[in-house]
């Protein structure tokens, strides 16, 4: 049973940041249209951004341009998923 949410593309962006810039990174990231949530983490990473869009190009722009332009990012790992609609078209 597929719903509208399963057709959306998502990305989880895990960040190591300079603590002095963390608050600014969170505030700016929340203004990006594809960013649905920003979470502070304990452990290997400092922040996780959850991105979502019907358009993979929008997610790509957010990661490749918007997030990369933020001051204070030390390291970034992106985990990008594809919606079920995209998976079905690949498998056909």
Where are the regions that the model predicts?
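A compositional/biophysical signature of low hydrophobicity enriched in polar/charged and small residues
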Residues: 1-92
């Amino acid at each position: 049973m597929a719903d509208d949410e399963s057709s959306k593309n998502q990305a989880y962006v895990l960040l190591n940041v300079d603590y002095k810039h963390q608050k600014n990174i969170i505030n700016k990231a929340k203004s990006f249209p594809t960013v649905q949530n920003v979470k502070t983490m304990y452990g290997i990473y400092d922040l996780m951004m959850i991105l979502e869009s019907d358009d993979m190009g929008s997610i790509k722009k957010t990661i490749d341009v918007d997030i990369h332009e933020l001051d204070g990012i030390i390291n970034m790992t992106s985990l990008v998923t594809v919606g079920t609609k995209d998976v079905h078209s690949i498998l056909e």
